């Protein structure tokens, strides 16, 4: 039977117990959320635009509201990784899964983001490959989360001929939610495309950015929705 514990509501405490037991049984570290930030590194994203993505993420992990959200994930915290995606077979893990247990870890993660370089400038935009590779990363890491989320950002639709529908359905079958950040730069109707063809799963959503200059605001808002406390 679950009882109220100081600092954690009864619902949250029950969720805590439900999360910890299976994770430990699998030899994995329990976390509230496993999150992959999947960044568009296709040819449509120039050097300045790519840098704005990186800077936006770094700023978000130093933002007081995001730091508070991370602290509210205690005692388990979050596991977060960053990948760059482009064409099929080109996805690159640039920051492996990192255990973010509190604000200090979040700030350190944000600093590491500033050191990340661009690994590719792919010729095509394969959302299908980015999602499939991110899902595989979620399945193979050393953490077990109450929620598993791919946070995919991009400035255009899939143009690689890959099976985007299969990729998102396979992710859903593995218990993964896909959220989107549509960067409304040159592609009209991209947000509607993300709503219909990209996001999937429980509480999935898409956050629009009005160009790359708006990415920092959009990723912060997105993280605040994703980094919600245990049991909520």
Give the positions of each predicted feature.
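Bacterial N-terminal signal peptides that target proteins for export
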Residues: 1-13
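Second-shell loop/turn segments in exported
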Residues: 38-48, 80, 96-99, 113-124, ...
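Von Willebrand factor A/integrin I-like adhesion domains
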Residues: 183-231
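Exposed acidic/Ser/Thr-rich ligand/metal-binding surfaces
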Residues: 118, 122-174, 224, 228, ...
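VWA/integrin I-like adhesion module and closely mimicked acidic/polar interface patches used
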Residues: 70, 156-197
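Von Willebrand factor
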Residues: 29-96, 100, 104-153, 180-190, ...
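N-terminal signal peptide c-region/cleavage motif recognized by signal peptidases
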Residues: 20-22
